[in-house]
Each structure stands twice: as C-alpha cells, then as structure tokens.
Amino acid sequence: KVIGKENVLDPETTRISQVDGVLKSIGMGYKKIAVTVVSADDTIKLREVESQHPEVKIYIFVAHATEVSKEDAEVILDHADVVTGCASRYIRDIGTERGFFRAGDSIPIFGITEDGKKFLEIRIEKIGGLKEKKDAQIPKPLI
C-alpha cells in the first residue's frame, strides 16, 4: 500500500515528530490515535494536545526507556498508557511500587491506565496467555 505524500508529516524533509504527527492525524479527522514515544516531554505535550481536543483519545506507548532519569520515569508513568520497562531501574521500581498492571519479567511491560491494561490483556489473550519463565533473566545492569 502506498502511503501518499499527503499522509506524511513533511514529505520534503521526512522529519519525525510524534506530537506534530498526532496533530496532523487530528487535522485529518482521526479521533483515536496510538503513538509510540521515547521521551517524557512528548508524553506531557501529547496529553496537552489531548486536553485541547476533547473529542480525541490519544493512546501513548513508551518504549526504549532504559536510561531515563528518576524524574523522567515519574513523568512517563504519570502520562503514558503502556510503558516497557527495558533495563530502566526507575521505570521498573516506580511501576512496581505504584502497583500498575504488569506483564513479563525479563522486560516487563506496564499497563498504566485502564486502556493500557486492556491493550495488554488483549495481547496476552492473543498469544495464549502469559508463560511462566523459570529463571527469568533481567538485564544487567539496570540503569
């Protein structure tokens, strides 16, 4: 399938901006938008965009959070729907401390919101349930 220039954020430079991509999607009439981000700042900006467009629901997935600071981990866990723990000590510790829905041991994935939890439950069902791992290996070191 051809995407088409009209559906690309900036066909000339092909720049990537999750926030601007979501704004473009809203401008194209989309009401339910899923977006993956890696920065705490983007989670804040996306929730601001969502608050300015009450008819739109933005589902925020955070990946590659290995080296986030404690402060950024808290921001991410305050704003995202689904977060991968990667090798992040702070995402893992704070996510566990707050009691978020969790799937997996080696690389945990947290369902932060009810929607995030539902996304994970649907995926778990599709793969036939969680499999218990004997001696699950976590990344070392956690950073």
Outline where the language-model segments fall.
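Conserved mixed alpha/beta catalytic, RNA-binding, or beta-rich assembly cores of soluble enzyme
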Residues: 1-143
